[in-house]
């Protein structure tokens, strides 16, 4: 086990109103996401992970996990995330719930 107090984690839950909203965001992300991620990684984002919530009876929920190495890295990324939200969620009905915290333990298989 490893403890690293410097890793900041953001867990975001996204709930879409329709499959059309999901498809629109996915299409936009496919087109513009790589350029946004390049900028975010340059600003200090350590990792990005997106997944489908499967223990709910809906294909309209997903999670996104972001990790940052420092508060400064997070602050450098926030303006870019504002651009991402504006571009990805324009004319989309979505509920976004975000939680930020400091990782207290991280375990990975060797």
Residue ranges and their predicted role:
Residues 75-78:
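A beta-strand edge to alpha-helix "cap/lid" segment located at domain peripheries
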Residues 4, 9, 33-36, 70:
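Terminal low-complexity, poorly structured segments
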Residues 8-17:
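Short glycine-/aliphatic-rich beta-strand segments at the starts of folded cytosolic domains
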Residues 15-16, 68, 81:
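Short beta-strand segments enriched in hydrophobic/aromatic residues
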Residues 20-48, 81-89:
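Short amphipathic alpha-helical segments
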Residues 1-8, 41-63, 85-110:
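Glycine-rich beta-strand-turn "strand-cap" elements at beta-sheet edges
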Residues 19, 67-73:
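Helix N-cap motif at beta-to-alpha junctions
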């Amino acid at each position: 086990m490893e403890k690293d107090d410097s890793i900041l984690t953001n867990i975001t839950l996204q709930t879409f109103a329709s499959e059309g909203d999901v498809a629109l965001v996915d299409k936009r992300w496919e087109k513009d996401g790589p350029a946004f991620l390049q900028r975010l990684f340059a600003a200090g984002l350590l990792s990005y992970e997106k997944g489908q919530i499967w223990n709910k009876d809906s294909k309209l929920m997903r999670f996104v996990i972001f990790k940052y190495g420092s508060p400064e890295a997070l602050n450098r990324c926030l303006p870019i995330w504002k651009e991402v939200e504006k571009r990805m969620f324009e004319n989309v009905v979505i509920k976004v719930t975000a939680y930020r915290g400091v990782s207290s333990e991280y375990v990975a298989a060797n």
